[in-house]
């Protein structure tokens, strides 16, 4: 192995674009990264679409980005798997979906479909919801729909178009839109249980915020400067369509991290201790894919185990490793990076740094980068391999606040400089990449804020003069390259090659 620790820093949402308009990364003052790019060899690697197991042209995301980096190969996940089953009509006979339908029939109860109504393809795809509506209808039931607003992976004010498409589906396959809630409430992942419970209570009909027409309600929220992500949970005033005992519920989100908390309230888990004051009896609760630690009735698409990940190779080589991130991205350097499973590897340590308790991260663009760096420097000499995530470019990028995103990038740059200095003192090497783009495109052609991810490539660079890169590449090449640099054998399961120039 190369002397000194080897560190992989994943800069979440740090994409590359030559276009300076709305580019918080190029326009920020980043003396460390500027010098690194000037003095050290580097390449730009693909982080979206077919390169990370998504449909061609689909924006990358943190889940598949970290999964691909850690696996050293393309792993076909939620969106592609489900799309394929829909295309081949295999979805029509999905065992769990039919069991949920039969449960509702047997109990003379409702079947509910809830999830992010968005074409974004990051946490869900509205087409999957439309297909489930069709299948439920063709099996003789009228589904009840619970809409989660997006506004992050798509434009901040785009849900009306999705609702119009949903209404077109419901004209052919009758059902009811019963509730609406912004993902801020229904998809929290930071243990802000007051948000999750507000969404949950709305689904159960405990709240008293009503609407007559969902599109009218959204327009009213818009008039109050409340957009899709933050839509206040509301429902129609009809006790027959609330979620209650004996019902069947299908959570249509395939990405787990933002689906776990609300699922815990419905079906319990091994990861949360939060008490549910309104538990339901004889509920058939189905989830689209495995949400680690959640204990549903059944899963439509159980996770396929990824073997011989980067972390496993390091552990099996007898080396020590550290994973470190703040709350918002902790699951990405652990669960996703390890192939979509919760695992404690031999000689592995994990450090979770609390995310700041703010509504949105434009309020504190530095996020917890300083605290992460402090903890890292304190522990750097204790480990052979370190994987860390800095969330700034992604989480502040998602707010659509350009000036704050610039501040986020500048804060990030100063922490990378600190890490660079320390790792060089230890005769170690730092590799830097990103999981997808975001903060490099903060404005559209009409100067409207952009909050979503991009399809742009990301940088792959090292602070070691001896490291030279072959080109081109993708996120799948990162793990083989670092293993090659360390002198470790690249497992056959990693079908992507090292980019290390010999």
From Swiss-Prot:
Pathway connected to this protein: Carbohydrate degradation; glycolysis; pyruvate from D-glyceraldehyde 3-phosphate: step 3/5
Cofactors: Mn(2+)
EC category: isomerase
Name of the featured protein: 2,3-bisphosphoglycerate-independent phosphoglycerate mutase
Catalytic activity: (2R)-2-phosphoglycerate = (2R)-3-phosphoglycerate
Matching NCBIfam families: pgm_bpd_ind
Active site (catalytic residues): 62 (phosphoserine intermediate)
Species this chain originates from: Malacoplasma penetrans (strain HF-2) (Mycoplasma penetrans)
């Amino acid at each position: 192995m190369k002397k000194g620790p080897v560190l992989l820093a994943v800069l979440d949402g740090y994409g590359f674009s030559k276009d300076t308009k709305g580019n918080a990364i190029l326009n920020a003052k980043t003396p460390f990264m500027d010098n690194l790019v000037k003095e050290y060899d580097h390449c730009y690697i693909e982080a979206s679409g077919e390169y990370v197991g998504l449909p061609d042209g689909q924006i990358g995301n943190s889940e598949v980005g970290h999964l691909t980096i850690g696996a050293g190969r393309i792993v076909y996940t939620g969106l592609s798997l489900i799309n394929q089953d829909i295309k081949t009509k295999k979805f029509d006979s999905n065992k769990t979906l039919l069991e949920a339908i039969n449960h509702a029939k047997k109990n003379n109860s409702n079947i509910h479909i809830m999830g992010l109504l968005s074409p974004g393809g990051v946490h869900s795809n509205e087409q999957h919801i439309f297909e489930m509506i069709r299948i439920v209808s063709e099996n003789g039931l009228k589904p009840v729909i619970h809409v989660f607003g997006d506004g992050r992976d798509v434009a901040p004010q785009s849900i009306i178009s999705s609702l119009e498409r949903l209404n077109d589906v419901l004209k052919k396959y009758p059902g009811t839109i019963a509730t609406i809630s912004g993902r801020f409430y229904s998809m929290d992942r930071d243990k802000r249980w007051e948000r999750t419970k507000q969404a949950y209570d709305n689904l159960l009909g405990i709240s008293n915020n009503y609407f007559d027409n969902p599109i009218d309600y959204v327009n009213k929220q818009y008039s109050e400067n409340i957009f899709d992500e933050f839509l206040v949970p509301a429902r129609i005033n009809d006790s027959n369509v609330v979620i209650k005992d004996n019902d069947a519920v299908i959570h249509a989100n395939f990405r787990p991290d933002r689906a776990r908390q609300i699922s815990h309230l419905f079906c319990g888990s091994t990861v949360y201790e939060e008490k549910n004051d309104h538990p339901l009896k004889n509920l058939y609760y189905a989830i689209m894919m495995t949400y680690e630690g959640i204990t549903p009735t059944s899963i439509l698409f159980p996770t396929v185990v990824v073997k011989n990940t980067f972390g496993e190779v390091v552990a099996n080589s007898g080396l020590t490793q550290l994973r470190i991130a703040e709350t918002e991205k902790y699951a990405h350097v652990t669960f996703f990076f390890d192939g979509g499973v919760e695992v404690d590897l031999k000689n592995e340590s994990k450090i979770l740094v609390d995310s700041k308790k703010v509504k949105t991260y434009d309020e504190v663009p530095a996020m917890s980068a300083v605290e992460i760096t402090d903890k890292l420097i304190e522990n750097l000499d204790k480990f052979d391999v370190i994987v860390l995530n800095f969330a700034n470019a992604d989480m502040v990028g998602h707010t659509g606040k350009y000036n704050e995103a610039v501040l986020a990038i500048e804060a990030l740059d100063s922490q990378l400089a600190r890490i660079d200095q320390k790792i060089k003192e230890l005769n170690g090497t730092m590799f830097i990449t990103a999981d997808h783009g975001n903060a490099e495109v903060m404005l559209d052609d009409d100067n409207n804020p952009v909050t979503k991810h991009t399809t742009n490539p990301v940088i792959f660079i090292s602070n070691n003069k001896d490291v030279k890169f072959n080109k081109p590449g993708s996120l799948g090449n990162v793990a083989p390259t670092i293993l090659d640099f360390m002198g470790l054998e690249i497992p056959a399961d990693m079908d992507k090659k090292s980019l290390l120039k010999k």
